[in-house]
Curated annotation (Swiss-Prot):
It comes from Bacillus anthracis. GO terms for biological process: DNA replication. The keyword Lipid biosynthesis does not apply. InterPro entries: DNA_primase_Znf_CHC2, DUF3991. This is Uncharacterized protein pXO2-78/BXB0107/GBAA_pXO2_0107. The keyword Cell membrane does not apply. Residues 323-332 have a biased composition (Basic and acidic residues). Residues 323-344 are annotated as: Disordered. GO terms for molecular function: DNA binding; zinc ion binding. Keywords: Plasmid.
Length: 344
Protein backbone atom coordinates (compact mmCIF):
# COMPACT_ATOMS: atom_id res chain seq x y z
CA UNK A 1 0.00 0.00 0.00
CA UNK A 2 2.81 2.43 0.90
CA UNK A 3 4.54 1.61 -2.39
CA UNK A 4 1.33 2.33 -4.37
CA UNK A 5 1.02 5.75 -2.72
CA UNK A 6 4.61 6.56 -3.64
CA UNK A 7 3.90 5.66 -7.31
CA UNK A 8 0.96 8.07 -7.60
CA UNK A 9 2.13 11.19 -9.43
CA UNK A 10 1.45 14.45 -7.63
CA UNK A 11 0.47 17.34 -9.89
CA UNK A 12 1.46 20.95 -9.34
CA UNK A 13 -1.03 23.81 -9.22
CA UNK A 14 0.26 24.95 -12.62
CA UNK A 15 -0.41 21.52 -14.14
CA UNK A 16 -3.90 21.42 -12.67
CA UNK A 17 -4.64 24.89 -14.03
CA UNK A 18 -3.34 23.86 -17.45
CA UNK A 19 -5.56 20.78 -17.52
CA UNK A 20 -8.60 22.74 -16.33
CA UNK A 21 -8.09 25.30 -19.12
CA UNK A 22 -8.65 22.75 -21.89
CA UNK A 23 -11.90 22.83 -23.85
CA UNK A 24 -14.39 20.09 -22.91
CA UNK A 25 -15.99 19.92 -26.37
CA UNK A 26 -12.65 19.56 -28.14
CA UNK A 27 -11.68 16.81 -25.68
CA UNK A 28 -14.88 14.97 -26.60
CA UNK A 29 -14.22 15.38 -30.33
CA UNK A 30 -10.72 13.95 -30.07
CA UNK A 31 -11.70 11.02 -27.85
CA UNK A 32 -14.77 9.63 -29.61
CA UNK A 33 -17.26 10.97 -27.08
CA UNK A 34 -20.23 11.92 -29.31
CA UNK A 35 -21.64 15.39 -28.64
CA UNK A 36 -24.29 17.43 -30.42
CA UNK A 37 -24.73 21.22 -30.37
CA UNK A 38 -27.92 22.77 -29.05
CA UNK A 39 -26.51 26.19 -29.92
CA UNK A 40 -23.16 27.89 -30.37
CA UNK A 41 -22.65 27.83 -26.62
CA UNK A 42 -24.39 24.69 -25.35
CA UNK A 43 -23.65 21.07 -26.22
CA UNK A 44 -24.90 17.78 -24.82
CA UNK A 45 -23.64 14.20 -24.87
CA UNK A 46 -25.41 12.07 -27.48
CA UNK A 47 -25.55 9.03 -25.19
CA UNK A 48 -26.42 10.98 -22.02
CA UNK A 49 -28.54 13.91 -23.14
CA UNK A 50 -29.04 15.16 -19.59
CA UNK A 51 -25.35 16.09 -19.54
CA UNK A 52 -25.06 19.68 -20.79
CA UNK A 53 -21.75 21.39 -21.62
CA UNK A 54 -21.59 25.18 -21.33
CA UNK A 55 -18.73 25.84 -23.71
CA UNK A 56 -18.44 29.50 -22.80
CA UNK A 57 -17.88 28.72 -19.11
CA UNK A 58 -16.13 25.41 -19.92
CA UNK A 59 -18.29 23.64 -17.35
CA UNK A 60 -20.60 20.63 -17.53
CA UNK A 61 -23.86 19.90 -15.74
CA UNK A 62 -25.09 16.32 -15.49
CA UNK A 63 -28.63 17.01 -14.41
CA UNK A 64 -29.82 13.44 -13.89
CA UNK A 65 -26.92 12.75 -11.52
CA UNK A 66 -26.67 16.15 -9.88
CA UNK A 67 -23.00 16.45 -10.85
CA UNK A 68 -21.18 19.41 -12.37
CA UNK A 69 -17.65 20.78 -12.67
CA UNK A 70 -14.70 21.51 -14.93
CA UNK A 71 -13.03 19.30 -17.53
CA UNK A 72 -11.08 17.31 -14.94
CA UNK A 73 -14.30 16.41 -13.15
CA UNK A 74 -15.88 15.70 -16.54
CA UNK A 75 -13.24 13.09 -17.41
CA UNK A 76 -13.59 11.53 -13.97
CA UNK A 77 -17.37 11.20 -14.29
CA UNK A 78 -17.78 10.32 -17.97
CA UNK A 79 -14.76 8.04 -18.33
CA UNK A 80 -14.79 6.72 -14.76
CA UNK A 81 -11.24 7.91 -14.17
CA UNK A 82 -9.45 8.76 -10.95
CA UNK A 83 -8.10 12.28 -10.50
CA UNK A 84 -4.54 11.20 -11.48
CA UNK A 85 -6.00 9.23 -14.39
CA UNK A 86 -7.96 12.24 -15.62
CA UNK A 87 -4.91 14.48 -15.34
CA UNK A 88 -2.77 12.01 -17.25
CA UNK A 89 -5.29 11.88 -20.10
CA UNK A 90 -5.61 15.65 -20.32
CA UNK A 91 -1.88 16.32 -20.25
CA UNK A 92 -1.01 13.49 -22.63
CA UNK A 93 1.78 14.90 -24.77
CA UNK A 94 0.44 13.25 -27.93
CA UNK A 95 -2.83 15.20 -27.81
CA UNK A 96 -3.19 18.89 -28.53
CA UNK A 97 -6.47 20.16 -27.11
CA UNK A 98 -7.81 23.65 -27.67
CA UNK A 99 -7.83 26.01 -24.72
CA UNK A 100 -11.28 27.18 -23.66
CA UNK A 101 -10.02 30.77 -23.64
CA UNK A 102 -9.27 30.50 -27.38
CA UNK A 103 -12.83 29.57 -28.32
CA UNK A 104 -14.60 32.62 -29.71
CA UNK A 105 -18.29 33.41 -29.45
CA UNK A 106 -20.23 35.84 -31.56
CA UNK A 107 -21.30 38.73 -29.35
CA UNK A 108 -23.24 40.54 -32.06
CA UNK A 109 -25.44 39.05 -34.80
CA UNK A 110 -24.12 39.03 -38.34
CA UNK A 111 -25.30 42.08 -40.28
CA UNK A 112 -25.39 41.16 -43.97
CA UNK A 113 -26.78 44.57 -44.97
CA UNK A 114 -23.53 46.18 -43.80
CA UNK A 115 -21.44 44.02 -46.15
CA UNK A 116 -24.01 44.04 -48.95
CA UNK A 117 -23.30 47.75 -49.45
CA UNK A 118 -19.80 46.85 -50.69
CA UNK A 119 -21.07 44.45 -53.36
CA UNK A 120 -21.06 45.48 -57.02
CA UNK A 121 -23.06 44.16 -59.95
CA UNK A 122 -20.05 43.38 -62.13
CA UNK A 123 -18.25 40.06 -61.72
CA UNK A 124 -15.36 40.39 -64.16
CA UNK A 125 -12.34 40.42 -61.82
CA UNK A 126 -13.69 37.73 -59.51
CA UNK A 127 -14.60 35.51 -62.45
CA UNK A 128 -11.22 36.00 -64.10
CA UNK A 129 -9.40 35.16 -60.86
CA UNK A 130 -11.38 31.97 -60.22
CA UNK A 131 -11.09 30.69 -63.79
CA UNK A 132 -7.61 31.84 -64.83
CA UNK A 133 -5.73 31.79 -61.52
CA UNK A 134 -7.52 28.98 -59.69
CA UNK A 135 -8.56 26.94 -62.76
CA UNK A 136 -12.17 26.57 -61.62
CA UNK A 137 -14.57 25.38 -64.33
CA UNK A 138 -16.34 28.40 -65.91
CA UNK A 139 -19.68 26.57 -65.77
CA UNK A 140 -19.28 26.07 -62.02
CA UNK A 141 -18.33 29.72 -61.47
CA UNK A 142 -21.19 31.10 -63.57
CA UNK A 143 -23.79 28.77 -62.06
CA UNK A 144 -22.92 29.77 -58.50
CA UNK A 145 -22.73 33.46 -59.41
CA UNK A 146 -26.20 33.25 -60.97
CA UNK A 147 -27.49 31.68 -57.74
CA UNK A 148 -26.11 34.60 -55.76
CA UNK A 149 -23.56 32.49 -53.89
CA UNK A 150 -20.43 34.12 -55.33
CA UNK A 151 -20.15 37.86 -55.91
CA UNK A 152 -17.60 40.66 -56.25
CA UNK A 153 -17.10 43.71 -54.05
CA UNK A 154 -15.88 47.21 -54.88
CA UNK A 155 -12.32 46.19 -54.00
CA UNK A 156 -12.53 43.37 -56.60
CA UNK A 157 -12.47 40.70 -53.87
CA UNK A 158 -14.32 37.45 -54.48
CA UNK A 159 -17.23 37.16 -52.01
CA UNK A 160 -18.48 33.76 -50.87
CA UNK A 161 -21.91 34.07 -49.25
CA UNK A 162 -22.82 31.56 -46.53
CA UNK A 163 -26.49 30.95 -47.22
CA UNK A 164 -28.82 28.88 -45.07
CA UNK A 165 -30.30 26.37 -47.50
CA UNK A 166 -33.66 26.28 -45.72
CA UNK A 167 -34.33 29.99 -45.21
CA UNK A 168 -32.16 31.56 -47.90
CA UNK A 169 -30.75 33.96 -45.30
CA UNK A 170 -27.09 34.96 -45.57
CA UNK A 171 -25.44 33.75 -42.35
CA UNK A 172 -21.93 35.02 -43.03
CA UNK A 173 -19.35 35.50 -45.71
CA UNK A 174 -15.72 35.07 -46.64
CA UNK A 175 -13.59 37.29 -48.85
CA UNK A 176 -10.74 36.33 -51.16
CA UNK A 177 -8.47 38.96 -52.71
CA UNK A 178 -7.45 38.65 -56.34
CA UNK A 179 -4.20 40.65 -56.15
CA UNK A 180 -1.03 39.06 -54.74
CA UNK A 181 0.97 41.04 -52.20
CA UNK A 182 3.83 40.28 -49.82
CA UNK A 183 2.08 42.16 -47.03
CA UNK A 184 -0.43 39.32 -46.68
CA UNK A 185 0.59 36.13 -44.91
CA UNK A 186 -1.14 33.95 -47.51
CA UNK A 187 -0.11 36.09 -50.46
CA UNK A 188 -3.46 37.85 -50.88
CA UNK A 189 -6.26 39.37 -48.82
CA UNK A 190 -8.36 36.70 -47.12
CA UNK A 191 -10.94 37.29 -44.42
CA UNK A 192 -14.12 36.03 -42.79
CA UNK A 193 -16.66 38.82 -42.44
CA UNK A 194 -17.15 40.13 -38.90
CA UNK A 195 -19.69 38.27 -36.75
CA UNK A 196 -20.33 35.59 -39.36
CA UNK A 197 -22.60 33.02 -37.74
CA UNK A 198 -20.73 30.26 -35.91
CA UNK A 199 -20.86 26.70 -37.27
CA UNK A 200 -21.75 27.85 -40.80
CA UNK A 201 -19.67 28.17 -43.95
CA UNK A 202 -19.86 28.62 -47.71
CA UNK A 203 -21.97 25.75 -49.01
CA UNK A 204 -23.51 24.46 -52.23
CA UNK A 205 -26.48 22.08 -52.22
CA UNK A 206 -27.27 20.04 -55.33
CA UNK A 207 -30.58 18.24 -54.79
CA UNK A 208 -31.07 16.73 -51.33
CA UNK A 209 -28.31 16.52 -48.67
CA UNK A 210 -27.91 12.74 -48.85
CA UNK A 211 -24.14 12.98 -49.29
CA UNK A 212 -22.18 15.51 -47.25
CA UNK A 213 -18.69 16.60 -48.28
CA UNK A 214 -16.58 18.93 -46.14
CA UNK A 215 -13.64 21.11 -47.27
CA UNK A 216 -11.06 23.33 -45.62
CA UNK A 217 -11.78 26.33 -47.86
CA UNK A 218 -14.18 27.81 -50.40
CA UNK A 219 -11.60 27.42 -53.18
CA UNK A 220 -11.11 23.74 -52.32
CA UNK A 221 -14.88 23.25 -52.56
CA UNK A 222 -14.99 24.84 -56.02
CA UNK A 223 -11.94 22.83 -57.10
CA UNK A 224 -13.58 19.57 -56.08
CA UNK A 225 -16.80 20.58 -57.86
CA UNK A 226 -14.74 21.25 -61.00
CA UNK A 227 -13.14 17.81 -60.88
CA UNK A 228 -16.34 15.92 -60.03
CA UNK A 229 -19.13 18.08 -61.43
CA UNK A 230 -20.93 15.12 -63.05
CA UNK A 231 -21.03 13.10 -59.82
CA UNK A 232 -22.65 15.46 -57.34
CA UNK A 233 -26.30 14.38 -57.36
CA UNK A 234 -27.98 14.85 -53.96
CA UNK A 235 -24.77 16.25 -52.51
CA UNK A 236 -24.14 19.10 -50.07
CA UNK A 237 -20.65 20.60 -50.38
CA UNK A 238 -19.60 22.60 -47.31
CA UNK A 239 -16.54 24.67 -46.46
CA UNK A 240 -15.51 24.52 -42.81
CA UNK A 241 -13.35 27.65 -43.23
CA UNK A 242 -10.55 25.65 -41.62
CA UNK A 243 -10.76 22.39 -39.69
CA UNK A 244 -13.88 22.83 -37.56
CA UNK A 245 -15.84 19.79 -36.35
CA UNK A 246 -18.59 22.10 -35.07
CA UNK A 247 -19.41 23.05 -38.67
CA UNK A 248 -19.61 19.38 -39.61
CA UNK A 249 -22.05 18.48 -36.85
CA UNK A 250 -24.22 21.52 -37.55
CA UNK A 251 -24.74 20.53 -41.19
CA UNK A 252 -25.05 16.86 -40.27
CA UNK A 253 -27.95 17.65 -37.93
CA UNK A 254 -29.58 19.87 -40.56
CA UNK A 255 -29.32 17.09 -43.16
CA UNK A 256 -30.89 14.56 -40.78
CA UNK A 257 -33.79 16.92 -40.12
CA UNK A 258 -34.36 17.59 -43.82
CA UNK A 259 -34.26 14.02 -45.14
CA UNK A 260 -35.53 12.28 -42.01
CA UNK A 261 -32.56 9.94 -41.93
CA UNK A 262 -28.79 9.81 -41.59
CA UNK A 263 -27.05 10.86 -44.85
CA UNK A 264 -25.79 8.09 -47.13
CA UNK A 265 -22.19 9.29 -46.93
CA UNK A 266 -20.00 11.67 -44.92
CA UNK A 267 -16.77 12.64 -46.70
CA UNK A 268 -13.88 14.63 -45.24
CA UNK A 269 -12.33 16.22 -48.33
CA UNK A 270 -9.46 17.83 -46.45
CA UNK A 271 -5.88 18.60 -47.47
CA UNK A 272 -3.50 15.72 -47.97
CA UNK A 273 -1.12 16.79 -45.21
CA UNK A 274 -0.35 16.14 -41.55
CA UNK A 275 -3.06 18.46 -40.21
CA UNK A 276 -5.73 17.09 -42.53
CA UNK A 277 -4.95 13.49 -41.62
CA UNK A 278 -4.92 14.29 -37.89
CA UNK A 279 -8.36 15.89 -38.28
CA UNK A 280 -9.68 12.79 -40.02
CA UNK A 281 -8.40 10.61 -37.18
CA UNK A 282 -10.54 12.63 -34.75
CA UNK A 283 -13.74 11.82 -36.63
CA UNK A 284 -13.50 8.47 -38.39
CA UNK A 285 -14.58 6.55 -35.29
CA UNK A 286 -18.03 8.17 -35.17
CA UNK A 287 -20.81 5.81 -36.30
CA UNK A 288 -24.38 6.70 -37.25
CA UNK A 289 -27.24 4.25 -37.83
CA UNK A 290 -29.64 4.83 -40.70
CA UNK A 291 -33.33 3.94 -40.61
CA UNK A 292 -32.62 0.65 -42.41
CA UNK A 293 -30.03 -0.35 -39.81
CA UNK A 294 -26.96 0.28 -41.97
CA UNK A 295 -24.04 2.21 -40.47
CA UNK A 296 -22.50 5.38 -41.87
CA UNK A 297 -19.08 6.67 -40.82
CA UNK A 298 -16.84 9.54 -41.85
CA UNK A 299 -14.44 8.67 -44.67
CA UNK A 300 -11.43 10.65 -45.88
CA UNK A 301 -11.27 11.82 -49.47
CA UNK A 302 -7.81 13.25 -50.05
CA UNK A 303 -6.49 14.76 -53.29
CA UNK A 304 -3.80 12.45 -54.66
CA UNK A 305 -0.51 14.18 -53.88
CA UNK A 306 2.62 13.69 -56.02
CA UNK A 307 5.24 11.66 -54.16
CA UNK A 308 7.52 14.66 -53.60
CA UNK A 309 4.77 16.83 -52.04
CA UNK A 310 4.11 16.87 -48.28
CA UNK A 311 1.03 19.08 -48.62
CA UNK A 312 -1.55 18.93 -51.40
CA UNK A 313 -5.01 20.48 -51.45
CA UNK A 314 -7.91 20.22 -53.87
CA UNK A 315 -6.93 23.39 -55.71
CA UNK A 316 -3.42 22.00 -56.23
CA UNK A 317 -5.07 18.95 -57.78
CA UNK A 318 -7.42 21.08 -59.87
CA UNK A 319 -4.49 23.06 -61.27
CA UNK A 320 -2.52 19.87 -61.96
CA UNK A 321 -5.40 18.35 -63.93
CA UNK A 322 -5.98 21.62 -65.81
CA UNK A 323 -2.29 21.74 -66.78
CA UNK A 324 -2.42 18.15 -68.05
CA UNK A 325 -5.49 18.98 -70.12
CA UNK A 326 -3.78 22.05 -71.59
CA UNK A 327 -0.69 19.99 -72.48
CA UNK A 328 -2.84 17.33 -74.17
CA UNK A 329 -4.70 20.03 -76.10
CA UNK A 330 -1.42 21.61 -77.21
CA UNK A 331 -0.19 18.18 -78.31
CA UNK A 332 -3.34 17.56 -80.35
CA UNK A 333 -3.10 21.03 -81.90
CA UNK A 334 0.55 20.50 -82.83
CA UNK A 335 -0.23 17.09 -84.33
CA UNK A 336 -3.11 18.58 -86.31
CA UNK A 337 -0.97 21.40 -87.69
CA UNK A 338 1.79 18.95 -88.55
CA UNK A 339 -0.71 16.75 -90.39
CA UNK A 340 -2.06 19.73 -92.32
CA UNK A 341 1.49 20.65 -93.30
CA UNK A 342 2.17 17.16 -94.59
CA UNK A 343 -1.03 17.21 -96.63
CA UNK A 344 0.12 20.39 -98.34
Amino acid sequence: MEQQKKNIKRYTEEEIEKAASLDIVDYCMQNDIPVKPDSERYYRLTEHDSLIIDRKKNQFYWNSRGVNGNIIKFVQEVEDASFPGAMQRLLDGEQDYEKASEITFVSEPYDYEHFEQKEVSRFDRAREYLIEERKIDPQVVDALHNKGLIKQDKYNNVLFLWKDRETGAVMGGSEQGVVKSDKYKRGAWKSIQKNSTANYGFNVLNGEPRNLKFYESDIDLLSYATLHKHNLKDTHLISMEGLKPQVIFNYYMKACERIGDVPDSLSLCVDNDKAGKAFVERLIHFRYEKNDGSIVAFKPEYPQAPSEEKKWDWNDECKRVAKQQEQREQGRRAAYLQQRGMER
